[in-house]
Amino acid sequence: GESEMYVTGPNVIREVTGEDITSAELGGARVQEQAGNIQAVVASEEEAFDYVKDLLAHLPTSTFDAAPVVAAQPDEELDDSALDTFMPDDTNAGYDMMDLLVQLGDDEDLVEVQAGYAENLICAFGRIDGRAVGFVANNPLYLAGCIDADAADKGARFIRTCDAYNIPLVY
């Protein structure tokens, strides 16, 4: 990306420590994403607008309003037997919890927040029967899904947001 955020620039770092570092390495978009300072990193301005539109579509206009409800499309491809094979038989094998969340919610309506930060915890807005919900799920593909300090911060922030807007949570 083209975005950077830092307190002291690369020139000062170079003069004080002798370390040669680029602006992107010091405070570029990926660095900020991994530090939990931003919600998402996207490739283009159009993708950024799409992400924001999708995110805001799940939130009410204020904390006094209800979240928008959309007409839920019947899920013709709903196959409960897919849930039977979701988890591997090997208890040491990882699995992507996002696959389950996609099946639980309405089709194509999952917006993950802070996907590049604390990847061991998934926080996402979605819909069930057209109603906005917040999904919080451990992701065994990263740190075996264990909650560390970053994941706890990420989850707490997301839960506070859902609470402020009266959006129910699915754990």
Predicted segments — roles?
Residues 1-2, 72-73, 130-131:
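Short hydrophobic/aromatic-rich motifs at helix boundaries and adjacent loops
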Residues 93-171:
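Non-catalytic terminal/interface segments that mediate subunit docking, oligomerization
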Residues 1-64:
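Conserved catalytic cores of soluble enzyme domains
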Residues 40-41, 90, 144:
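Glycine- and other small-residue-rich loops at beta-strand/loop junctions that grip anionic moieties
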Residues 28-30, 71-74, 164-168:
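Short C-terminal domain-edge/linker segments immediately following a structured domain
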Residues 44-101:
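Terminal amphipathic helices with adjacent charged low-complexity linkers/tails
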Residues 9-10, 29-36, 75-83, 134-139:
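Short acidic (Asp/Glu) and glycine-rich catalytic loops that position anionic groups and cofactors
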Residues 9-21, 57-67, 114-124, 155-164:
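Phosphate-binding glycine-rich loops and adjacent basic patches that engage nucleotide phosphates
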